[in-house]
Amino acid sequence: MLTERGSWKFGADTLPWRLAKDKPAGARRAPGGTDTPEARRMAQGSMWPDNAQLAMSFVVNVEEGAEYSPREGDRHPEPVDELGIALKRPVRNLGNESSYLYGVHAGAPRVMALLERYGIRATFTAAAVALERAPELARAIVAGGHEVCAHGYRWIHQFSMDEAAEREFIRKAAASIETTTGQRPYGWLSRYLFTEHTRRLLIEEGFTYHMDDYSDDVPFWDVVDGRAIVVVPYALDSNDMKMWTAPALTPEQWLAYAIETFQVLYEEGATRPRMMSLGVHLRIIGRPGRIRAFQRFVQHVRSQPRVWIATRREIAERWAAANPRRLA
């Protein structure tokens, strides 16, 4: 896989994105738009609509009901929970299952109401089965004008799948989401780990952007077997999942970190394109003790004059239009 990124500067020196020793032997830069007038304008910071300094992406993960469970034939229950209890036996963790369902029953109404109140159009990264089992939520997402991005058929790992199984997993997710929501998903987010085939399969199945990357603050092209896809990097450091994986992290600390991230990127965006991703979960941020931290972050974003709040598909399309690839 060959990647293309817009040029960037740090101080007066132009630096490479990666060290020469990290480049695979025999690799060459794929022909692209890094020398076009559009790319030069992008590098000067005029990439986003209305001269915005920052593209802000809100990502709401919908995984509830699609997680691991012996009920679904899995060998173990879901290992990710608020208490850090990971059972190794093939028995259902009914307590954790109910904790996940909280996201649908109580968390979702809070999150949806907050997004509506502040006029936020988000990207909902949804495991297809989760939406199948929560049709009212699926309808609310569509009615709110949000984007639905595929987050797997179920919220399970795909890194151990062979190519045929992974292709079927991707196809089933896309077909299910389109049936449930009426929207064909154009983006994909794996359950963290993916395979060397994933990006090629996504291209072949008609996806236009991929989120499984954490290497930059702007999108970039990846080229696989001569075909291109936009990579829209995600972020884990500001994700509300940190309040589950690090239970001592308070909502106030999470909020402070998120705001600091926003401020640095917003200031950098005055001279170069920048994007911020904030990922949240219905069952986590939707809790009464956490929802106001999310609200305060949204209020902070809304208080800044030059922010473009957009779905990830909009960001991918805008970046691709401003930084077109040239075929060899």
Task: Describe each model-derived feature in a short phrase.
Residues 233-264:
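A conserved mid-domain beta-alpha-beta active-site/ligand-binding segment of alpha/beta enzyme cores
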